C-alpha cells in the first residue's frame, strides 16, 4: 500500500518539479516588487503549500519523522544529509523519487541550497532508485547556486549523454540567468536551437524579469520577439509577469494590454490572472470593474488555494462585501493550518467593511492561536485603529509591542502618523513621519500599496488643514512610486491649494505630465484654485 501511495506522490511531485516557478529568488525579481506585501499575496498555483503537505503527512503518520523532508530540515548543523537518509532507510522506508522531489522543493523554498545539493549528491552517488533527467537537473541547479556557472558547466559535461537533453539545457540557461550571466545564457539558447531543442517558457520568464529593472524595460519587447521567433509555447505565467510589472507601475492600460495579449495568444486566463486584474482595478478605485473581475475569480478558482482566498478577502474588504468576506474567512478557518498572514488580512478586511469588533476578535484569536512573533502582527492592528483615528487604542498597541520586546519599524511610525493626523494632532503626525524616515525602508515597502495608501491618507489630512508644504513633501513620495497616475492622488494635493487659497499655474500641467487623467473633480478643484490668481 505504501508503495502505491509513494508512486502516486512521485508522479505528482515530478509534475510540480518540471514546472519550476518564477518564485525562485533572483535580484531582479526583488527589484520589481514581486512580493506578498507589495500588491499580490502570491502568484503560486499549487493548491497546498509545502508546509501544509508536511503537516498533513504528520497527521497521517502520527510522527513527523515519517516525512523525509522534515528529517532533513531538522538536521543539526554539521550532521550530513546522508545520515538522515541512512536513518530513514534504517526505519524501513525506501527512498522514493517522490520523497526526494518533495524535499528538494521545500529546501529550495526555504533557501537551504547547501542541504539540497548534499541530498542530490547522495542520490547520484548511492542510486537508491533508477535515476532520470530530473535528478541531474536538480544537481546542476544547486551546483551553480553554490559554486557558480563555471562549475555548473563542468558538471554538465560529466552528465551521462542520454541526460544532456532539453531539460538539462533549459536548467543550465536558467542557472546562467539567475547568476546574471546573460550573454552566456543566450549562447546556450543558440546551441539549443542548433540541436533542435525547445526553449522553455521559464527561460523567457527569467529574461523578462532580468530586464524589468529601470532602464532595461525596453528590452522586454525583444525578449517577447525572441520568444515568438523560437516558437516557444505561450504560457500563462509569462503574461502574469507582464501584467504584474504594469500593475506595480500603476498602469491600468498596460495591465489590460498584457491581458489582451494573453487572449490573442490563445492562453486561457486562470484565477491568478483575474486576481491581478481585480486588485489592479481595486487599487485604482475602479470598484465596479474590480467587482466584475472578482466574480471571475470565484468562477475560475480551483480547490482551496489559500493564496487566492487571501486575495478574495482583500477584495471583499475593499468592495465592502461583509457577507462574502465572512464566507471566505470561514473556508480558510477550515484549513488544518491557518497562517498568521491570513489572520492579519482578515483583521484588516473586516475593519474596512466597518466591523471593528470582528477585526479585534480575529486579532486576539491570532494572538492566542499563533502567538506574537513579529512587528508586522502589531502593525496590522495599528493600521486598523489609525485609519479610524483611534489614537488611544493605537498607543495601547504600540506599548504592547515595545513591552514585548518588538522594535517599531518605519511602517509602525507611518501608521501612527496617520492616526495622529486623523485625530488632528498634526505636530505629532510630523514627528512620527520624521521618526519613520530615520529608519531604513526598503524600496519594496516604500512602493507597496498599503504604504502608498497610508501616505495618501496623511496627505488628505494635511490638505484639509491647507498645509501645502507638507502635502507636497509627501506627494513627492507617492510620485516616486508612480502612484500619482491616479486622478484621486492629484485631487488630494489640489485640495491643499484650495484650502490654503494658494494659486499655482502648473498644477494641471503637472497632472498631465505625471500620467494622470483629470476627472470632473480635478477640473472643479482647478477652477477653484484659479480664483486665487493674483
Swiss-Prot record:
Q: Which GO terms describe its molecular function?
A: mRNA binding
Q: Where in the cell is it found?
A: Mitochondrion
An annotated GO cellular component of this protein is: mitochondrion
The record's PPR repeats, renumbered to this chain, cover: 165-199, 200-234, 235-269, 270-300, 305-335, 339-369, 374-408, 409-443, 451-485
**Gene3D superfamilies recorded for this chain?**
Tetratricopeptide repeat domain
Q: Where mainly found?
A: mitochondrion
According to the UniProt entry, where is the signal peptide? none
InterPro entries linked to this entry: Pentatricopeptide_rpt, TPR-like_helical_dom_sf
UniProt keyword Oxidoreductase, yes or no: no
Keywords carried by this UniProt record = Mitochondrion, Repeat, Transit peptide
A Pfam cross-reference name: PPR_2
Which positions form the organelle transit peptide? 1-20
Similarity annotation: Belongs to the PPR family. P subfamily.
The protein's name is Pentatricopeptide repeat-containing protein At1g07590, mitochondrial
What organism is this sequence from?
A: Arabidopsis thaliana
Amino acid at each position: 500500500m505504501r508503495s502505491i501511495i509513494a508512486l502516486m506522490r512521485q508522479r505528482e511531485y515530478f509534475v510540480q518539479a518540471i514546472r519550476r516557478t518564477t518564485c525562485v529568488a533572483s535580484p531582479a525579481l526583488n527589484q520589481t516588487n514581486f512580493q506578498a506585501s507589495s500588491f499580490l499575496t502570491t502568484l503560486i498555483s499549487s493548491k497546498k503549500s509545502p508546509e501544509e503537505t508536511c503537516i498533513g503527512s504528520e497527521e497521517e503518520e502520527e510522527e513527523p519523522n515519517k516525512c523525509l523532508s522534515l528529517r532533513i530540515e531538522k538536521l543539526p548543523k554539521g550532521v550530513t544529509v546522508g545520515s538522515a537518509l541512512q536513518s530513514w532507510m534504517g526505519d524501513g522506508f525506501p527512498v522514493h523519487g517522490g520523497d526526494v522531489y518533495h524535499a528538494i522543493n521545500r529546501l529550495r523554498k526555504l533557501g537551504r541550497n547547501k542541504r539540497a545539493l548534499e541530498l542530490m549528491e547522495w542520490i547520484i552517488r548511492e542510486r537508491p532508485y533508477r535515476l532520470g533527467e530530473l535528478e541531474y537537473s536538480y544537481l546542476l541547479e544547486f551546483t551553480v547556486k553554490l559554486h557558480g556557472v563555471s562549475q555548473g558547466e563542468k558538471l554538465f559535461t560529466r552528465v551521462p549523454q542520454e541526460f544532456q537533453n532539453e531539460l538539462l539545457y533549459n536548467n543550465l540557461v536558467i542557472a546562467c540567468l539567475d547568476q546574471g550571466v546573460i550573454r552566456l545564457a543566450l549562447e546556450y539558447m543558440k546551441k539549443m536551437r542548433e540541436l533542435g531543442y525547445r526553449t522553455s517558457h521559464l527561460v523567457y520568464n527569467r529574461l523578462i524579469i532580468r530586464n524589468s529593472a529601470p532602464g532595461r524595460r525596453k528590452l522586454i519587447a525583444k525578449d517577447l520577439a525572441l520568444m515568438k521567433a523560437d516558437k516557444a509555447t505561450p504560457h500563462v505565467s509569462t503574461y502574469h509577469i507582464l501584467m504584474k510589472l504594469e500593475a506595480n507601475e500603476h498602469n491600468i492600460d498596460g495591465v489590460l494590454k498584457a491581458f489582451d495579449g494573453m487572449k490573442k495568444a490563445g492562453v486561457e486566463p486562470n484565477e491568478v490572472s483575474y486576481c491581478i486584474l481585480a486588485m489592479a482595478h481595486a487599487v485604482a478605485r475602479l470598484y465596479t470593474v474590480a467587482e466584475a473581475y472578482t466574480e471571475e475569480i470565484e468562477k475560475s478558482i480551483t480547490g482551496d488555494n489559500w493564496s487566492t482566498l487571501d486575495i478574495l478577502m482583500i477584495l471583499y474588504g475593499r468592495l465592502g462585501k461583509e457577507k462574502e468576506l465572512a464566507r471566505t474567512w470561514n473556508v480558510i478557518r477550515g484549513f488544518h493550518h491557518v497562517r498568521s498572514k491570513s489572520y492579519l488580512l482578515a483583521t484588516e478586511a473586516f475593519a474596512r467593511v466597518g466591523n471593528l469588533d470582528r477585526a479585534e476578535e480575529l486579532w486576539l484569536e491570532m494572538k492566542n492561536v499563533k502567538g506574537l512573533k513579529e512587528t508586522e502582527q502589531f502593525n496590522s492592528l495599528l493600521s486598523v485603529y489609525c485609519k479610524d483615528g483611534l489614537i488611544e487604542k493605537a498607543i495601547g498597541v504600540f506599548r504592547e509591542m515595545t513591552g514585548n520586546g518588538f522594535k517599531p519599524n518605519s511602517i509602525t511610525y507611518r501608521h501612527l502618523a496617520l492616526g495622529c493626523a486623523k485625530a488632528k494632532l498634526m505636530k505629532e503626525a510630523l514627528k512620527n513621519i520624521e521618526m519613520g524616515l530615520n529608519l531604513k525602508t526598503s524600496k519594496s515597502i516604500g512602493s507597496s500599496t498599503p504604504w502608498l495608501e497610508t501616505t495618501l491618507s496623511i496627505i488628505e489630512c494635511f490638505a484639509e488643514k491647507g498645509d501645502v508644504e507638507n502635502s507636497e513633501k509627501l506627494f513627492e513620495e507617492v510620485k516616486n512610486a508612480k502612484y500619482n497616475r491616479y486622478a484621486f492622488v492629484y485631487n488630494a494635493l489640489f485640495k491643499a491649494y484650495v484650502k490654503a487659497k494658494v494659486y499655482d499655474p502648473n498644477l494641471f500641467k503637472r497632472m498631465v505630465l505625471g500620467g494622470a487623467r483629470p476627472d470632473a473633480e480635478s477640473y472643479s478643484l482647478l477652477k477653484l484654485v484659479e480664483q486665487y490668481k493674483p
